[in-house]
Amino acid sequence: MNFKVLYQDNNARCGVFNFNQEIIETPVFMPVGTYGAVKSISTEEIKNTGSRIILSNAFHLYFRPGLEIIKLHGNLHNFMNWSGPILTDSGGFQVFSLSRFCKVNEEGVIFQNHIDGKKTFLTPKISMKIQSDLGSNIVMIFDQCIEYNQNWEKTKNAMERSLYWAKKSRIYFDSYKNKNSLFGIIHGGIYPSLRDISLQELIKIDFDGYALGGLAVGEPKIEMYKLLDHICPQIPKNKPRYLMGVGKPEDLIEGVRRGVDMFDCVIPTRNARNGHLFVTNGVIKIRNKKYKKDLSCLDNTCVCYTCRYYSRSYLHHLDACNEILGARLNTIHNLHYYQTLMSNIRNSIKNNTFEQFSVNFYKQKNKIDF
């Protein structure tokens, strides 16, 4: 993977990834396909929303369907029929958030897996092997995630352990001699001084990109933005910056404003399944009875499949009947909205009009009552 920044408007950056001749423009939003599927839609439909790179979760795929099944197909790309790049999360977050029993030592984590309750040992070495077997284009280091608002000492200990695992991840990743990329993850909770130490040590190890972990886990938005203001300027300018698990449309705007290049989040797909649909002026809650006889499309500025062929009335009906088609059409629309937003952001950076674009974005938002 090669990465190059081509345009800059203040701190906002527009660049390109080159994955073996496949070009991905940044800033980029990655739909989440945890189990090798973006819920309710096919890979062809994912591509038609404008999505070119997706995220899957190595932790979940390790347990279901298991590496043996995926390797029968060659790799995860073949298994799910996706020709574009895939970033895999190592599973650190899931280990610490899903497990009923979790014991951490220097080598890794012993936990009860959420499938059958069996004790499982996961280490940087195992995580790198899993992601290598999946054929991930971007591999994330194995890290220790902690809850928001932990005290300084607990946060420092977790950050230092993540650094130790980062070094191990680098060694084991390099041993596979593949041409894929490895990203480090900056930790340190809400403490800027710990974030500084984490980043500087990760830079010494030398990763292909740097992710900001442990954000959007309960902290006030202003706190997240302040941390981005603090840490993004310190990340090497020639390396991509990835804000993990974020965000809402306004988070994408504010992340890009601070120099972030990559995002992922379940919000567009999860909200779609719950009938919350993103449009130019805000959010439509399609299950509200006011849409029962509304013959208009979701958003007359949108050219997605859903907006071209279906009315709000029909989408309201599908939601009321719990029809699977409703989730599918809603997901297509929300992902198309996100990818259109990212495309517009990129164009504004290229034209040095990002600030005006963001002003217009907030002006349009919530102009009418949904």
UniProtKB/Swiss-Prot annotation:
Cofactor binding: number and manner: Binds 1 zinc ion per subunit.
Pfam family, one: TGT
GO terms under biological process: queuosine biosynthetic process; tRNA wobble guanine modification; tRNA-guanine transglycosylation
Residues reported in the UniProt entry to bind substrate: 89-93, 143, 214
InterPro entries reported in the protein's UniProt record: ArchSynthase1/Queuine_TRR (IPR050076), TGT (IPR004803), TGT-like_sf (IPR036511), tRNA_ribo_trans-like (IPR002616)
Pathway(s) the chain acts in: tRNA modification; tRNA-queuosine biosynthesis
Catalytic reaction annotation: 7-aminomethyl-7-carbaguanine + guanosine(34) in tRNA = 7-aminomethyl-7-carbaguanosine(34) in tRNA + guanine
Gene Ontology cellular component annotations, sorted alphabetically: cytosol
Transmembrane portions of the chain: none
Catalytic machinery residues: 89 (proton acceptor), 264 (nucleophile)
Keywords per UniProt: Glycosyltransferase, Metal-binding, Queuosine biosynthesis, Transferase, tRNA processing, Zinc
Listed cofactors: Zn(2+)
Top-level class of the enzyme under EC nomenclature: transferase
Record: residues binding Zn(2+): 302, 304, 307, 333
Subunit structure: Homodimer. Within each dimer, one monomer is responsible for RNA recognition and catalysis, while the other monomer binds to the replacement base PreQ1.
Entry similarity comment: Belongs to the queuine tRNA-ribosyltransferase family.
Protein name per UniProt: Queuine tRNA-ribosyltransferase
Organism: Buchnera aphidicola subsp. Acyrthosiphon pisum (strain APS)
Lineage, broadest ranks: Bacteria, Pseudomonadati, Pseudomonadota, Gammaproteobacteria, Enterobacterales
